[in-house]
């Protein structure tokens, strides 16, 4: 390359010296572009733009993003998670595939800036990942952890490490030797065992999140066990690092005074610094976080100054951890734990940094770290054999010692195996730990390569295997019939009422009043307030009956729900039992909380608010949540009991039951009966409502001319007629039920009938009857907009009918074991 010295004034006089080597300073990190401007001369103009630092980094970012997205597009269909795609991207760009001195290797290599820019970005990504995972983690999970989780967590880690060490010293001592000389150091072996026996909470949480098992009973148990595992292993690893520093340090304890040890011994200084930092996080940093929360007005965002100040402390803690010879993530993770999870502070930090860290920088960190994987060095069978044996033994021991306590606590065999697979899963923490150890010289290059390939294999096999072994929907299926049709007379009706927003409270209470609660026919209402999980990793289910007075002040904005339903309980004292819960979860997993609570409390009916709400005059839709709609559909598919979707309309003078009683009128309810199990379930609820003197029930039975002329022959129709006979007998006995039979021969006549009665009632009750073919609805399914409401329910809520009444759509229990 020829340089023109006249373009650089301070090199003009020395440029012609043949013995002088000149460089261009300062180095320009950015190019002048593909088409540089002649008005802005660049002394490095002869260098290709991609050889500049910043364009090179941007190209690597782009290639990594394209590759891992490409891999994940196909691998997710096989049940694999994103981390596997990140690893494959890194291996594809590593020395194993891109050989030295090839054009592709020179173009895609990060070695030129490995110790500067790429290393800095990777380190920042990794420590920010751990800080955010610390913010997500709820330490109260440890206090509420049961004996089962403690036993599994300790057994899978501490007991596994102990057993592995005994096996090594008693049986496998000669495995890591070559001609009598040790191939692997003692600390290398212990480090491998320690990492292999660990179950990292962030890794387990990410696996469960991507497999949508976070809300399952197995997922909660796995996360609780992982928390116990994390803390026990963190303490153990810190002790091991301290002992290694003592060994490597030139100064010895000997027979010196304790004061000399503390002052003169570097490992002791560092250990003391770690203890002081933990005390700082607990007694200074965490109170400051609560001070920030106190200074933030309710409903207002946290000031950016506070967030950036916290991030500066996070970077400082990483530097301190590195000085103390600890992993750089230890400091940020401790500070993350000290940040109160959830809104306003925890959620504000996550909303600001989570997407860029998890979506961009973390894949880049994994891919660039995997660049060091080099399969060409796997030449020695002794090396391979020793590492493979250590990894295999640790996996088998950990798997067995996780399965054993779970089985002893009465878990099914399949669930025990699934839990052991979850606890044995390896991810970004283990890969980062091996990369850090490789850079520090704790493990050899061949060890790093073999362990990295094992992590890739582990992450590629366990998630698909889990999907085949464990079906979370199976646990919601009941062994008994849990519906209103098969309830014993005068038995307690158990209802799970779901609240998505405060606007759902009044309509839900009004509907519960219509179920006729009395001392002879009591109603048990389990109220579940569902809120989106923001600012923490583990889902939370709060029982407000079990809360202390202190925790009631932090009820995640559920005060209105609790107070309103307590008043409902007082209004019907002795007839209504109310138990209120708040569930914090990600939207895709909320159905797990609903189904599990219904299963545990043996409810007969789940009531879900419809995903759309209307204005007061009914002229416009004021909210339309696709998330709530998908949640309702998931509950319909997996529910352990009957389900009702409640479409509330308050317009056109529609009244509540109390308002009708005050005006000496009755609350008008219409039950449309077309036939089928869902209609029979809906009619059972209508019969119960008829016991309330404030409610008038009208049962409109649709019958075709063919059905009227011919006698019923199929079993389903015979069940319909039997239930209708019971309704007619109640009418003859003086019950407040109006029964009418309408002859309808096609869908057009059904539409005309509904249009004629649409505004005569306060509430319609219909069955969903998904997939049931009927002469009454033939052809209408093509025009149905919301299939979760069924054909009749969808028609009643459509704008064409202009119905101003509320609608309750019932689906009978579907899942049975």
UniProtKB/Swiss-Prot annotation:
Keyword Transport: yes
Domain of life of the organism encoding this protein: Eukaryota
Entry keyword annotation includes Transcription: no
InterPro entries for the chain: Cation/H_exchanger_TM, CPA2_transporter, Na+/solute_symporter_sf
Sorted UniProt keywords: Antiport, Ion transport, Membrane, Potassium, Potassium transport, Transmembrane, Transmembrane helix, Transport
Transmembrane segments: 54-74, 115-135, 152-172, 189-209, 223-243, 273-293, 304-324, 328-348, 387-407, 417-437, 446-466
Membrane disposition: Multi-pass membrane protein
PANTHER family reported in the protein's UniProt record: CATION/H + ANTIPORTER (PTHR32468), CATION_H(+) ANTIPORTER 4 (PTHR32468:SF17)
Job of this protein: May operate as a cation/H(+) antiporter.
Family designation: Belongs to the monovalent cation:proton antiporter 2 (CPA2) transporter (TC 2.A.37) family. CHX (TC 2.A.37.4) subfamily.
Protein name (database record): Cation/H(+) antiporter 4
């Amino acid at each position: 390359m020829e340089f023109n010295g006249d373009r650089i004034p301070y090199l003009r006089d020395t440029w012609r010296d043949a013995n002088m080597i000149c460089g261009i300073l300062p180095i320009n990190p950015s190019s002048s572009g593909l088409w540089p401007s002649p008005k802005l001369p660049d002394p490095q103009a002869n260098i290709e733009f991609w050889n500049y630092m910043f364009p090179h980094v941007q190209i690597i970012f782009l290639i990594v993003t394209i590759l891992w997205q490409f891999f994940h597009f196909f691998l997710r269909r096989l049940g694999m998670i994103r981390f596997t795609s990140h690893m494959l991207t890194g291996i594809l760009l590593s020395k194993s595939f891109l050989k030295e001195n090839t054009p592709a290797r020179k173009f895609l290599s990060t070695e030129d800036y490995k110790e500067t820019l790429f290393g800095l970005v990777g380190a920042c990504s990794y420590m920010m990942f751990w800080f955010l995972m610390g913010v997500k983690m709820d330490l109260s999970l440890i206090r509420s952890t049961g004996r089962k989780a403690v036993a599994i967590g300790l057994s899978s880690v501490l007991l596994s490490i102990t057993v592995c060490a005994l096996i090594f010293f008693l049986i496998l001592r000669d495995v890591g030797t070559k001609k009598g000389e040790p191939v692997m150091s003692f600390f290398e072996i212990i480090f491998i065992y320690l990492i292999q026996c660990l179950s990292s909470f962030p890794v387990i949480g990410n696996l469960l999140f991507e497999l949508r098992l976070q809300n399952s009973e197995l997922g909660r148990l796995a996360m609780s066990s992982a928390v116990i595992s994390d803390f026990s292993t963190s303490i153990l690893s810190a002790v091991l690092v301290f002992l290694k520093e003592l060994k490597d340090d030139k100064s010895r304890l000997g027979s010196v005074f304790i004061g000399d040890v503390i002052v003169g011994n570097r490992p002791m200084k560092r250990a003391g610094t770690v203890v002081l930092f933990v005390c700082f996080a607990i007694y200074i940093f965490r109170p400051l976080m609560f001070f920030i929360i106190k200074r933030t007005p309710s409903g207002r965002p946290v000031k950016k100054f506070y967030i950036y100040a916290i991030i500066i402390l996070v970077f400082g803690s990483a530097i301190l951890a590195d000085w103390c010879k600890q992993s750089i993530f230890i400091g940020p993770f401790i500070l993350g734990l000290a940040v109160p999870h959830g809104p306003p502070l925890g959620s504000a930090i996550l909303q600001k940094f989570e997407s860029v860290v998890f979506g961009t920088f973390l894949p880049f960190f994994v891919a660039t770290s995997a660049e060091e994987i080099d399969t060409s060095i796997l030449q020695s069978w002794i090396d391979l054999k020793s590492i493979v044996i250590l990894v295999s033994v640790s996996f088998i021991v950990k798997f067995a010692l996780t399965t054993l306590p779970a089985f002893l606590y009465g878990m099914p065999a399949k669930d025990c195996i699934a839990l052991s697979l979850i606890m044995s899963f390896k991810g970004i923490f283990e890969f980062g730990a091996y990369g850090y150890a490789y850079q520090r010289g704790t493990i050899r290059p061949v060890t790093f390569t073999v362990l990295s390939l094992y992590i890739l294999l582990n992450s590629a096999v366990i998630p698909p295997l889990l999907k085949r072994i464990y079906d979370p929907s199976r646990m919601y299926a009941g062994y008994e019939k849990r519906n209103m049709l098969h309830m014993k007379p005068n038995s307690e009706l158990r209802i799970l009422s779901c609240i998505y927003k405060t606007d759902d409270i009044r309509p839900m209470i009004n509907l519960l009043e219509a179920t006729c609660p009395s001392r002879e026919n009591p109603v048990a209402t389990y109220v579940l307030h569902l809120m989106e999980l923001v600012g923490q990793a583990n889902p939370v289910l709060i029982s407000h009956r079990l809360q202390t007075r202190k925790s009631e002040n932090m009820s995640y904005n559920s005060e209105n729900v609790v107070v309103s339903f307590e008043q409902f309980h007082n209004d019907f004292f002795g007839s209504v039992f109310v138990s209120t819960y708040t569930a914090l979860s990600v939207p895709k997993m909320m159905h797990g909380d609903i189904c599990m609570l219904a299963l545990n409390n043996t409810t007969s009916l789940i009531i879900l608010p419809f995903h759309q709400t209307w204005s007061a005059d009914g002229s416009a839709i004021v909210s339309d949540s696709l998330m709530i709609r998908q949640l309702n559909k998931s509950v319909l598919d997996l529910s352990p009991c009957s389900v009702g979707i409640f479409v509330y309309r308050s317009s056109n003078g529609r009244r509540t039951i109390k308002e009708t009683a005050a005006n000496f009128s009755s609350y008008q309810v219409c039950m449309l009966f077309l036939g089928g199990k869902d209609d029979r379930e809906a009619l059972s609820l209508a019969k119960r409502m008829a016991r309330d003197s404030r409610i008038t029930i009208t049962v409109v039975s649709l019958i075709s001319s063919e059905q009227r002329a011919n006698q019923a022959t199929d079993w389903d129709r015979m069940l319909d007629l039997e239930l209708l006979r019971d309704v007619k007998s109640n009418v003859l006995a003086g019950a407040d039920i109006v029964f009418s039979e309408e002859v309808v021969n096609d869908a057009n006549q059904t539409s005309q009938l509904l249009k004629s009665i649409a505004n005569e009632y306060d509430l319609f009750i219909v069955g969903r009857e998904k997939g049931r073919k009927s002469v009454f609805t033939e052809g209408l399914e093509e025009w149905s907009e919301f299939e979760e409401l069924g054909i009749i329910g969808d028609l009643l809520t459509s704008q064409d009918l202009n119905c101003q009444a509320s609608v309750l759509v019932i689906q009978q229990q579907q899942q049975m074991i």
